[in-house]
Amino acid sequence: MKILRIMVMGVAALVLALALLVWFMPARWAVAALGPRLHGMRLEQVDGLVWHGRAGRVLSADGIDIGQVQWTLSRRALLGDVRLQLALQKPGVTFDGTLHRLAASVVDWSHVRLQADAALFDGLPWVRGNSLHGRLNVHIVDARVQGIWPMQLDADAQWQNASVDENGRRVMLGNFHLRAQGNGGVIQLELGDDGTGPLQATGHASLSPLSWRYTLVLKPRTNDPVLRQWLAGFGKLAPDGSLQLHGSGGLARLTSRMEQ
């Protein structure tokens, strides 16, 4: 009995020691242990605990400086209930939001706010112009993401004081807003402007993993030749200077054509 009691006490002491180690684990230990699962991302200048810590510098796999990050991880993660608050900051960009993992490939994002200089999107293939200007504000009330696709979405975004540099000239655009709502994996987007800027914009898009379609109408409110020339780069203008764009595609549309 004495030997059994000693063994039980020893196991209890070991469990307690492990619990204390996990409870007060330094964040840098956890980052080192998770290294292979970060897919090349590097966290530097790490301090704090695994439950509440920060990294003074985060680098992507290709060496891009993402910024500094702070996090708070609920201790309920020990029971499999992962709830994480993230805050990221770098010059021109701030991000904060809450993540709740529901399953291996399903997460909920809520209370997400992103503020960024529009120049962050310079170089993207769909951006026409040498440089974007203005401020982007994104608010995601809730987004349930399965894999990489939002199955449910409630969000809005604004592009304030929007303008584009092209061929050494500044193209003034105005202020725009985008509303995004989704359910069952189908996302509806509505685009508009504040009614006072140089460019009137109205648009609608529907996106799903199987198909997409959009309509967009852009019309100058002034006779600015620089703005009209920039619009003409996207397609043929109507006599009133407006531009209408529309398109659709995806697997569902391809299947429909094959059945006809």
Language-model segments: what does each one mean?
Residues 56-58, 70-72, 87, 137-139, ...:
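Residue-level recognition of well-ordered beta-strand positions that form the cores
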Residues 62-70, 89-98, 124-141, 169-176, ...:
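Amphipathic hydrophobic-ligand
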Residues 14-58:
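N-terminal amphipathic/hydrophobic interface segments
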Residues 2-12, 21, 36-37, 166-260:
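Extended terminal
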Residues 83, 150-154, 213:
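Outer-membrane beta-barrel architecture
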Residues 98-186, 196:
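Elongated, acidic membrane-bridging lipid-handling scaffolds
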Residues 90, 161-163, 220-222:
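Transmembrane beta-strands of outer-membrane beta-barrel pores
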Residues 41-130, 137:
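N-terminal beta-strand/beta-hairpin edge segment
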